Amino acid sequence: VARVTGKATSLVLESTLGSPLDYPNPGSYLKAMGLNLKERSSGKHKGQLKITKRGSSLARKYHYFVALRWPYKDPIIARWYRNKVRRDGQLKGKAIVAIMRKLARTLWHIARGEVFDSRKLFDVRSLGMNA
């Protein structure tokens, strides 16, 4: 996990959330981090999907900084990020939260011995890149 996130972030995630191996599926790891989505609605008002923020704020903070760096490290993620920002009307925060969620799921799989490959996270063909 430290190879993807860095040593400091890896230590913070491990100390606040425990090992990703302790969680039965990636969704439960997302939930522990407070990154699961919930609709904010009231009465007849149908709200948008927002993260719940019920998990560790420290883990989310460090995870956020990793997600900010990710588009600069990988061209596939950078292309996806630019497309997402363009599609959502310049909402960069929404794109970063989407990257945070993808990263959390990735960390769960990496903890189980899978090799990190950004082509597994994003549809490379729809991004106009070679597979």
Specify the residue positions occupied by each region the protein language model found.
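Phosphate-backbone recognition surface of nucleic-acid-processing proteins
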Residues: V1-R3, K7, V12-D88, K92
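Low-complexity, acidic/Ser/Thr- and charged residue-rich accessory regions of DNA metabolism proteins
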Residues: K44-H45, Y81-A131
